[in-house]
């Protein structure tokens, strides 16, 4: 066993829970923050052209790019959490099969999606709303980011997820952070130095594609150099079993669906706010960017928690599994409270960073101070979804995702808008997240009570034969592998 493998085993089994969580979560949080800065910087650089058609052309590609993220989530979250559970159950050979399958699944999906996009570029862009003025800009950007960049993007996100789920969070976080920093550096270089005026959107696309290729190459070399017993590129060990494939997609699909519904919620909010005034739309648009900071930190914390919870669940170490959730939940609540305090105090300054118009600043300040109150409940709803993903409970995670966005958040937007207008739209996030967090907690409590009362770990569909004992109970697996 190599030094990295021993270190991973120490993190999963021996290291104190707060220290283990920090080792897993801090690199992930840093990479999340760098990607947040990159996304803002990309928008900033394209906006510097003062060409609305160029800005619109780049924005049109977002739904296509989100498909790449969804595919990466299927392979990364579905495969990654399954690998962590298999390692906890001491099934390293099955974990190897899932690891290689996840990587090649991401590569083939990326190639397939890139070819489809290239073939059907014009009808796809027109379907998304491209006009004669924006089509060429959108085509240039999509060619670089999707046709050239889809495969390395999906593969990079998948490999970083897999690395984190075998305990190598530092390497995964460094790779994603490196890609974001390279992109931030290359954007102005290609947009304003190397390419002539009028080609800025092409420069942004080249910078994004190149940074993703570099990140993917780095991750490939890292996995080969580490010689990890689980992560490899050979398919000679065979395919995962039917049960493991069911778990792969059972957890991966809900993880992929979440970002789509998240974006749908934002679209509905924008449309409803636009009906009130352009200033209100501008204000909420800025708020949605500013509020991403604690959200991305919370997601990074959840992603760091998942491998620890998954491993100890299958290892039969329920006390440590519960301690991981408690530590992550406590840290997330503390960060949320700090974020609320900072945003309440400095809301006007934060809005002025993006715009100087007094009316927009005033409205944006109000909206930010209202929406940030939901931070704690939003984090709690996120952490329970990730927790059920870690346990292989894909159906429960899917139920919570659908309930959150389709059954509660989006209907609440329409209701609060009708009752209280644009300020009702701002308050809807808090109202919805209180309901979602309470529902998530009830389902979590029910699942834990069933485990302790029956002595059976509810692993139906998790694709893993569990080992060990839980608090004196014998573990049984309801899924026949």
Question: What kind of feature is each model-predicted range?
Answer:
Residues 23-42, 144, 179, 211-215, ...:
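Transmembrane helical elements of multi-pass membrane transporters/channels
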Residues 37-55, 125-132, 189-199, 260-293, ...:
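Helix-terminus/linker motif at the lipid-water interface of multi-pass membrane proteins
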Residues 46-66, 132-139, 201-203, 243-251, ...:
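Interfacial/gating helices of multi-pass transporter permease domains
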């Amino acid at each position: 066993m190599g030094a990295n493998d021993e270190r991973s085993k120490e993190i999963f089994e021996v290291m104190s829970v707060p220290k283990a969580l920090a080792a897993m979560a801090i690199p992930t949080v840093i990479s999340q923050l760098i990607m947040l800065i990159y996304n803002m910087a990309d928008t900033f650089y394209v906006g510097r052209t003062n060409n609305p058609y160029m800005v619109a052309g780049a924005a049109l590609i977002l739904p296509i790019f989100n498909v790449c993220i969804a595919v990466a989530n299927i392979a990364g979250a579905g495969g990654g959490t399954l690998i962590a559970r298999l390692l906890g159950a001491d099934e390293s050979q099955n974990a190897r099969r899932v690891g290689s399958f996840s990587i090649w699944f991401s590569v083939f999906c990326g190639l397939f999606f890139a070819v489809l996009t290239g073939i059907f570029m014009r009808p796809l862009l027109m379907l998304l709303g491209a006009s004669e003025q924006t089509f060429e800009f959108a085509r240039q950007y999509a060619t670089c980011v999707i046709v050239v960049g889809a495969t390395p993007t999906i593969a990079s996100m998948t490999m970083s997820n897999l690395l984190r789920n075998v305990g190598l969070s530092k390497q995964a976080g460094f790779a994603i952070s490196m890609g974001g920093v390279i992109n931030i550096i290359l954007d102005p270089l290609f947009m304003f130095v190397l390419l002539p005026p009028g080609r800025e959107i092409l420069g942004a696309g080249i910078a994004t594609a190149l940074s993703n290729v570099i990140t993917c190459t780095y991750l490939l070399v890292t996995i080969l150099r580490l010689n990890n017993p689980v992560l490899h590129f050979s398919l000679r060990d065979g395919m995962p079993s039917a049960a493991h494939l069911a778990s792969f997609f059972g957890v991966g699909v809900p993880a992929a669906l979440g970002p789509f519904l998240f974006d749908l919620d934002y679209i509905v909010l924008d449309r409803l706010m636009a009906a009130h005034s352009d200033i209100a739309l501008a204000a909420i648009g800025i708020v949605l960017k500013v509020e991403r900071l604690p959200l991305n930190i919370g997601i990074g914390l959840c992603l760091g928690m998942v491998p620890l919870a998954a491993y100890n669940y299958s290892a039969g170490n329920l006390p440590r599994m519960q301690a991981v959730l408690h530590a992550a939940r406590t840290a997330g609540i503390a960060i949320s409270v700090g974020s609320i305090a900072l945003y309440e105090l400095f809301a006007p300054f934060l809005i002025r960073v993006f715009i100087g118009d007094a009316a927009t600043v005033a409205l944006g300040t109000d909206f930010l101070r209202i929406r940030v109150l939901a931070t704690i409940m939003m984090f709690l709803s996120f952490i329970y979804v990730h927790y059920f993903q870690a346990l292989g409970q894909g159906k429960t995670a899917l139920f919570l995702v659908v309930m959150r966005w389709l059954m509660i958040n989006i209907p609440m937007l329409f209701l609060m808008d009708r009752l209280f207008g644009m300020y009702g739209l701002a308050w809807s996030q808090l109202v919805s997240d209180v309901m979602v967090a309470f529902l998530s907690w009830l389902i979590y409590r029910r699942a834990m009570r069933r485990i302790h009362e029956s002595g059976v770990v509810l692993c139906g569909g998790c694709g893993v034969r569990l080992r060990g004992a839980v608090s004196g109970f014998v573990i049984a697996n309801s899924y026949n592998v």
